[in-house]
């Protein structure tokens, strides 16, 4: 790793964040479909502000937003002892082998210009598994725990965007395939704007906060 760099297990992080929210008395409502029209920030009985992080669910209010399909494979490989994320050079897209706890590895991800959420294709599965096997023969006897498909919310320039809608609504979208890497910088920029109406953090990270973009 580079100096000061680290790695994390994304699922463990999400669970830790969830428990932290619950510990602070935050009510979390899963699978509750909402639109911006369901809220009137600042009015009596309504939240003071609204942060819209719906990804592709915000397509109607986020011009240029599209889905980019990604597939990943989760394996249990007791014979493999990789301890650091490994990037493979692939002709179609970047592929990573990400080690998790107890010899679990995530291999991914494909990058296909479609928001199709059908099950993973044979081609993609073969590419990911073959890539893993070329790195370590121990993957030949690995057990497939999961093959998952999802679509990444992506803007035209493949960069994230913060958009101010009205006085009390902030949209954050377009994190593409860099969510866990760039999220801390976006959080700093968003908090700076929400708490202080300042763009200093956004400017420091090279992010642009756009005003009143429909």
What spans do the regions from the language model cover?
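Active-site substrate-recognition segment that forms the wall
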Residues: 54-166
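A short local loop/turn or secondary-structure capping micro-motif enriched for an aromatic residue
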Residues: 38, 114-117, 179-181
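C-terminal catalytic lobe of FAD-dependent flavoproteins
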Residues: 142-214
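Short, hydrophobic alpha-helical segments
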Residues: 21-28, 136, 190-198
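Helical element adjacent to the flavin cofactor pocket in flavoenzyme catalytic cores
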Residues: 2-49, 53
């Amino acid at each position: 790793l580079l100096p000061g760099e680290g790695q994390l297990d994304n699922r463990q992080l999400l669970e830790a964040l969830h428990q932290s929210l619950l510990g602070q008395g935050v009510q979390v409502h899963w699978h509750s479909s909402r639109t911006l029209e369901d809220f009137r920030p600042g009015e009596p009985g309504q939240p003071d502000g609204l942060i819209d992080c719906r990804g592709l669910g915000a397509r109607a209010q986020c011009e240029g937003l599209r889905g980019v399909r990604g597939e990943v494979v989760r394996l249990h490989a007791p014979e493999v002892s990789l301890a650091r994320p490994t990037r493979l050079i692939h002709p179609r897209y970047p592929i990573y082998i990400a080690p998790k706890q107890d010899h679990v590895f995530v291999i991914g991800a494909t990058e296909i210009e479609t928001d199709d959420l059908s099950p993973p294709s044979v081609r993609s599965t073969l590419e990911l598994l073959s890539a893993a096997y070329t790195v370590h023969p121990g993957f030949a006897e690995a057990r497939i725990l999961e093959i998952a498909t999802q679509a990444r919310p992506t803007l035209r320039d493949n960069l994230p965007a913060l958009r101010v809608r009205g006085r009390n609504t902030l949209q954050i979208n377009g994190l593409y395939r860099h969510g866990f890497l760039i999220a801390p910088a976006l959080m700093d920029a968003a908090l700076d704007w929400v708490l202080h109406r300042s763009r200093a953090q956004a400017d420091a990270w090279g992010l642009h906060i756009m005003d009143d973009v429909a």
